[in-house]
């Protein structure tokens, strides 16, 4: 039996601002934007090429906004991905790698090249470059 992670809840304070950030600046696909009753709204977005989506919502969960850290997006070319984010107005860190427990500015080896950014609500994201696939 397969167990698949399909949806991650991302706690936010402002649905419209978060939808614009993820849809227009980060480049996620907006799959769904629906109002469920008077107090509940759900927006589903999916990163290009991903099988896992995220929900931005109000009135569904009791998760404080801005508490998620380490949400990880794996990309084939971190320089291109980071440049796309910066071009769209996202503040992204320099490209870094971990060396003996310390972050160092420059590329690392396989699976050890990263950049970081946060959404407007303070949730932290990690870009990680995967090795080239044959």
Residue positions per predicted region:
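Ampipathic, surface-exposed secondary-structure segments
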Residues: 55-92
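Conserved short beta-strand elements that form part of the metal-binding/catalytic scaffold
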Residues: 29-68, 118, 124-129
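A generic structural signal for ordered alpha-helices
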Residues: 6, 23, 56-59, 63, ...
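A generic structural micro-feature
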Residues: 2, 63-65, 108-109
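Acidic di-acidic motifs
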Residues: 14, 77, 119
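Core segments of cupin and vicinal oxygen chelate
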Residues: 2-3, 9-52, 80, 87
């Amino acid at each position: 039996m397969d167990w698949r992670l399909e949806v991650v809840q991302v706690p936010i304070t402002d649905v419209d601002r978060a939808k614009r950030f993820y849809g227009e600046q980060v480049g996620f696909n907006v799959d769904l934007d629906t109002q469920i009753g008077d107090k509940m709204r759900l927006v589903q977005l999916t990163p290009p090429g991903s099988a896992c989506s995220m929900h931005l919502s109000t009135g569904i969960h009791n998760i404080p906004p801005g508490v998620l850290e380490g949400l990880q997006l794996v990309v084939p070319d971190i320089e291109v991905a980071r440049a796309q984010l910066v071009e769209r107005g996202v503040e992204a860190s320099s490209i870094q790698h971990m060396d003996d427990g310390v972050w160092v500015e420059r590329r690392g080896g396989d699976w050890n090249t990263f950049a970081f950014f946060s959404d407007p609500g303070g949730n932290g994201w990690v870009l990680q470059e995967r090795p080239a696939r044959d």
